[in-house]
């Protein structure tokens, strides 16, 4: 199979950009969040039923993939178009060697000098087509700006509504700061009685890096053992131990 045309390369990238067979993960590449995958997953996506169906309907845009060499040619066209770039996933120790800060949630990726197209080699998507959500976001921003500029023309009931909403928002912020101060006072007072447990916390996950609802669960806890970050760290330890045992 000859190298796909530029139009075919774009069509294939659009089709496979969010394909489930890629089993994409998110990582940090050049200080930004990106999607990355293994080369063998891309080959699997090209051999999927979804791609085969497209290939039958539009063979000029989606060339048939009958061998690994065909998949290789398609992938090379994506590299030449700079839709994907080879990368190396760094471990924590390697991050420090390259002056990068290890991240608990997202692995750090480093640009590779060559693409060998090995099954377990990592590749990063640099192609990010615009989605409907992106267009809706732009439209929403424009509508919001125009609505704000036209505030003097708003009817009285809308102005009253925005006033009450702003008061409610300020009240919520005040309640949040109030809870933060109360929990700190309770913690300091509890150290004398339960210092061996690390102190008593109301809403131990209040300032943790988690969702809004999770920030208020559980209602109370002792020390850091009820914290979201501590529990997440313990889960990672158990997973790593399980992998080593396998």
Curated annotation (Swiss-Prot):
It is found in: Endoplasmic reticulum membrane. The chain crosses the membrane at residues 135-155, 169-189. Part of a complex that contains SEC61, SEC62, SEC63, SEC66 and SEC72. Required for preprotein translocation. Keywords: Endoplasmic reticulum, Membrane, Protein transport, Translocation, Transmembrane, Transmembrane helix, Transport. Residues 1-134, 190-246 are cytoplasmic. One of its GO terms (biological process) is post-translational protein targeting to membrane, translocation. Pfam families: Sec62. This is Translocation protein SEC62. It comes from Kluyveromyces lactis (strain ATCC 8585 / CBS 2359 / DSM 70799 / NBRC 1267 / NRRL Y-1140 / WM37).
